[in-house]
Amino acid sequence: MSHPNKKFNNVQEWLGIPYGTASRFQKAQIVPFEPNHEYSQSGPASLQLTDPAFLNSDKGESEDCLNLNIWAPDNVQEKLPVVVYIHGGGWTYGANSQDTSDLSGLVASGKVIGVSINYRLGALGWLELSQYGGKFKDASNLGLQDIVLALKWINQYIGSFGGDPNQITLTGHSAGSFSLLTLLAVPEADGLYNKLAAFSGYAARYIPAWWAEELADKVLKTLELTSPEQLLTVDPKSLIKAVNQVLPTDVLKRGNLDTISIGIVDDEFLPNGVLKANPADVIKSGKHKDIDLIITSTTEEASWYAANIPDNVDPKTIEAVIDEMVYDCHIPRKQAEAIALHCGAGKDTPLNVRTRFFTDYNFTLPAIREAHDHAQAGGRVYQLSVGPAEGSPAYHGTDMYGIVGQSAPDASQEQLDRDNFISQTLLNFATDHHEKLWSPVKKNQLIIKDIGQRPYKGVEHAKTVLELFKGIPRP
């Protein structure tokens, strides 16, 4: 049963609908929709090491977290396009109950149905265990498998809520966007979506299989377990904490070339791998050129770390920044020195130079390359560069309220206008009003829409980044 939304009086909502169920480290199974149940409270979030208040979950956290929220306009007269939001949080935190996962703002336009999903996080969703076989044979990218299952559920049941299963736009932020672009290399997801709008996430930064297996081994040793079977009964919070103990404490180091982190595993060559190709290669091949894309980045993505946890990520010297580029990112030293100079070496602090480098290396570069590759293959792709607004620096996450059609608390008028542009962009994209969007990227021409205050022109900066990073991989 639906209930009126508390923010918008023309929106109905169904909260905490179970879409799947799974035992620990097992492949989830679909749960049929029960239309007569009460859906007045958001379902539990995945277990995580986050302040529960941040999640706004009515039912706290649980391993049994596979639920979704649906919002629909009152009195839907015809089948509407559907926008599905996949939350971010580095595959370790977040929920569909956060304010920045609440699609009621987009739905209040009367133009779309909104869905926001939960999936398993941290060790429970992304620890690679398939190498142990037996009960763990399917334990590869379980969180991604959860997302695919949610899309199957939506395809089967969204018509009951006024949604058109043949008009599905997936969107998300950060880890959510990395995940949705990865679906291009997951054949099981084919036909379950029509458009992808990726905000600050790309077909990149995959966990190499060697590290995924090493991480599992280190977790077992940290927990002093003698058999993988013991993972099935160990305290789940202890398991999640063990992963944190193993990963680099300097979070920026997790984004270097080898991606020593937890997240989507490049499991293409594993026996029960979910990915059947490298997603960036799929984009380049044109196999999914029929899927329209939006790809975005902000002008100061990694500066969030300098502003919020400077002691954790401060390299202290420019030499340390350059050495990191050379040894951890495999950039030739002369090229690394040129990149450091471009990022402010000699004029700014080593910390700011480092965060500018990671903004370009982990965000700007893959955004440009993937937009170019999709256009070259004959696909339609819109590229957006988000700058700061008054009271809202263009850090990673600055656009999250705009994506879902909500207003950030205490937002300036400039931020509200910028975020409203993002909301309207997503609505026009999902409803096929391409005439209301800017020009897509062309085969041999960079086209980037700039919004917010501009520290640079997007196209000019993109040309500089492509030249500086020429020949440098960012898988």
Map each language-model feature to its residues.
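Non-catalytic accessory segments of hydrolases
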Residues: M1-N141, P165, T299, P409-Q424, ...
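Short glycine-enriched nucleophile-adjacent loop
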Residues: S177-A189
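Catalytic nucleophile serine of serine hydrolases
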Residues: P165, G172-A175, P187, S200
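Alpha/beta-hydrolase active-site loop
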Residues: C65, K137-G159, D217
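Alpha/beta-hydrolase fold nucleophile elbow
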Residues: P81, I154, F161-H173
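Substrate-access "cap/lid" subdomains that shape
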Residues: Q156, D190, F199-T317, T355, ...
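Active-site loop->helix "elbow" adjoining a glycine-rich segment at hydrolase catalytic centers
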Residues: G88-G89, L142-D146, S174-S177
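Mobile gating loops/cap/lid regions near enzyme active sites that modulate substrate access
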Residues: I17, F358, N362-P475
